[in-house]
Amino acid sequence: MKKKFHFAVLLLLFAAGRRSQAQNTIFLSQGKIEYERRINQYARMEDENSWTELEKKTMSQFKTSYFDLLFSHGKTLYRPGRESADKGSSFFIDQPAQDNIVYADLDNEKSVSQKKIFEEVFLVQDSLRKIKWKITDETRAIAGLSCRRANALIMDSIYVVAFYTDEILTSGGPESFSGLPGMILEVSLPHQHITWSATKVEAVNVPDAQLAVPVKGKKVNNSTLLETVQHSLKDWGKQGQQYMQLVML
């Protein structure tokens, strides 16, 4: 009888602990996330056989950039963040997606992106990217938040690994990545050797004025932009293909 009583007490204590933990979890509806984007330039060079060891030595292995994502309820704004200490040269003469500003209205499934491609600025107005995610059981902590892994395939051939947290209610993410039951804190494109990873999450008030829709650039949709970029890069070979993939993310 005593054993049963002790076991019942332990169950009650465990349940109370779990309930207390759930009550202490803060679910964010607005705030700011900093992402670090890392491109493994050496790996990209190995994919492009024309590069020499001498050329490889002129640049650092990883090209690092920082971006901020502001979010408030069903809206997000992804934009360039603080300057990186990385001053090394780039695999690309013109670093693609370096100045991207991406606004997403998640409730209405609309996106407006301002993208600089070479010397021209485009304003891409379209619906949100449709991504068929497959959620897995793998978990990890990112920026202090518990995250779960999901996999997907985009643009017919790009394999995506993402980790999202349901502790942030907004279902957004960096660049055009969204559609999971929470905020995406890490995205990896293994075959493109690129990773976006949240370095910090701040619970701050985000006024509507800070989520301003970008307005600068030639108005296009994703299909028109793809045709334009393909035409411009038709003689670039494999490097052109890699550039185009970054532009269209």
Q: Where do the model's predicted regions map?
A:
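Bacterial Sec-dependent N-terminal signal peptides
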Residues: 1-28, 246-249
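Extended soluble regions of mature proteins
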Residues: 23-249
